Amino acid sequence: MADDITETSQTVAAGQLRALIERIERLEEEKKTIADDIKEVFAEAKGTGFDTKAIRTIIRLRKKDQAERQEEDAILDLYMAALGMV
């Protein structure tokens, strides 16, 4: 009886593990598809004449809140002033 419970537990654990791995694999495939889509959009932007580096910077900045951006700008200004760049 104890062997049956252990075997059942192992079967359930193996099934759960397999399901988790398959979910991760599907998500990885979706991630790859999305990355390819993003790459295509950047290629389209470049083909239209937009600067993709600037677009990436804007996207990065839009992810941050205003206070965080202001703090980074202040530090950047301070460092540039210290180096005589402004």
Swiss-Prot record:
Signal peptide: none
GO MF annotations, alphabetized: DNA binding
Top-level taxon: Bacteria
InterPro entries membership: GapR-like (IPR018753), GapR-like_DNA-bd (IPR046367)
NCBIfam families from the UniProt entry: PRK13694.1
Similarity comment: Belongs to the UPF0335 family.
Protein name: UPF0335 protein mll3968
Gene source species: Mesorhizobium japonicum (strain LMG 29417 / CECT 9101 / MAFF 303099) (Mesorhizobium loti (strain MAFF 303099))
Source lineage: Bacteria, Pseudomonadati, Pseudomonadota, Alphaproteobacteria, Hyphomicrobiales
